[in-house]
Amino acid sequence: MNWEFIEKYLPMYEKAALLTVKIGIVGILFAILVGLICAAVQYYKVPVLRWIVTVYVELSRNTPLLVQLFFIYYGFPKIGIRMSAELCGVVGLAFLGGSYMAESFRSGLESVEPIQSESAISLGMNSRQVLGYVILPQAMSTSIPAFVANIIFLLKETSVFSAISLMDLMFTAKDLIGLYYKTTESLFLLVVFYLLILLPVSIVGSLVERRMRYAGFGD
């Protein structure tokens, strides 16, 4: 292991990690927004929109992110829509992640027994109170494991951004391997930085899930 090489190119990986995290966070935030909207449409069975959401979810979940990125990055300019590589990464991640988030949120909402909502209404609660005090707390608790898994999955999927010339972690590792043939050192840094990004997400997700279950949500 060449530690001098690692020390020399560590700042390059730090810069790439910041770009990876920035695109990942923005893309995931949009994915959550898309997921919430789609889950609400499916849960309340909104006519027409429900079928549009179903088509979107199936299309998104059954095509690789790399194909989606190529379609956005190389296909959209053919119809006059041009995006930077960073924006393309955000859109691609949001498109893919939105479908996974939608399924997580939908399953969480549907895990709450209808009789609980009916009982709450019989006690005098209105629809907003039922949603806020009965359905959402339990649905959130049920959704957390899948939600955290989706975040980790999407952050790992950022590794394909190098295919559209984004100078992320994977691009940096491949570039250094091609230039200096330092495969072990380059991949070592790649693994270390992905662990630094993903492990905190996993730990925080587990703590939140444990805290909510301790508080009695979802039981």
Language-model segments: which ranges?
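Transmembrane alpha-helices and adjacent helix-loop boundaries
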Residues: 1-219
